[in-house]
Amino acid sequence: MLIKYGETNVTDRLLDYKMSVSFADCRMIGNVPSIELTMKFDNYDGILDNIDISKYWEVKENDASDTRYFKVYDQPEKYTKELTLKMYDNNYSLDTAYDTKLSYPVTIKDQLDEIESLTGLSIIREGIPQYVLDKSVSWYDNTIVIRNYLGWIAELFAANVYAEGIDSIRFVPIEKTAFATTQDLTDYEKNEVYTLTRVYAENGLNPLSKGDETGNTLFIDSTNLYADEQSIIDSIYDRLKGLTFNQVKNVTMISIDNLLPGALVNYNSNEFTFFVSDLTVNYKGGQFSMSTVDGSVTTKNEEKTVKRVSNTTRIRKLQVQQDQESLKLDIIAKEQEGINDKMAQLSLSNEKISLRVTEVEEKAGEAIKQAQGSVKKFVCEYASSTDGVTPPETGWSETAPT
């Protein structure tokens, strides 16, 4: 074990070490996990008092493990002779709004270039397919954090995003082969077998899928607006089809070097293979550390948690055009909150029925006004159109025609 604070080696002061990292919402791909590291030090002489939170901590668990870098983002409430510090890797800093200044449409490569300049982190492009980098993007939401954007991009080629080195992040695709083999499980709960046979994306009126339902379905995050082409779903399926492992809980084992969520581990010469979605490493001295693993993935079509930043002014833009047989959908939505300027429009025609949706904002008291909050509701009205395309000027009713 090697631990350095700046250039100061504090390894001999270590009393307790706990590293934890997990995937959100039990999802297999599209994750941007941040490693949380909690360490307790002997601070008898106050050498760690008033730490500089701008400095990186360098951690290397053993000679065979990668060197990882962490920062303390908040000063301890108080400094004591036994000092506990909580720190995170660079992915933690990605929870900031993607305040893009690009003129849309752009490509994903353009967005990654801008994210590099906004975060100061280098995005390693090795392994990102060219069709992903070249994909055109015509939408943005500047209240959604950069971490979500990177996760959505990673999902396009069955990858996750990890911090690497002192100032980089890397996209790492899921592999169907085991990352490591071990015989050192001291406890485990083995559950059902997961076999991927289908990939499915909701995508509004036009669901996209590849494969069949003989096994398990990988559901693409329904909030991922990048995942809008059949070719993307085909590519994810081709990469992951046949992926098989046992879901597990409460695995206790001797730690495996450089293991992170997203990897497969083979136990006892192919007795079974399990997926790592949640990992905790504890070290209290001695020759090795111990790990606790959970390996569950979702089998339901559930929305991924989207983290937003609350700004005084929010700007959202969305443009969607879709044509599926007789269905025609054109959506143009813009909204600015905090400056009293709003616009929303939705037009849908299917044969002779048109749907008009208008947005109504109601102020709910002085407290809400001060918080610049609002309550929104949608009123749906129907009318018969003579040509099935042009919405009529009159005859609108909240009752659907029979």
Predicted feature descriptions by range:
Residues N224-V248:
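C-terminal, beta-rich DNA-binding module of retroviral/retroelements integrases
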Residues M1-L102, Y140, W152-A158, G165, ...:
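Assembly/oligomerization scaffold segments
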Residues F272-F275, D323-T402:
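Surface-exposed receptor/substrate recognition regions of extracellular proteins
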Residues T11-F23, V132-Y140, L185-E189, V276, ...:
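A broad structural signal for short, well-ordered beta-strand segments within beta-sheet-rich domains
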Residues R13, T107, Q111, V145, ...:
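Short amphipathic alpha-helical segments
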Residues V59-E61, I115-E116, G262-S269:
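Alpha-helix C-terminal capping segments
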Residues P76-Y194, T217, Y226:
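Charged- and aromatic-enriched interaction segments used to assemble
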Residues M1-E7, Y79-M87, K101, R170-N224, ...:
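Acidic, low-complexity/disordered segments
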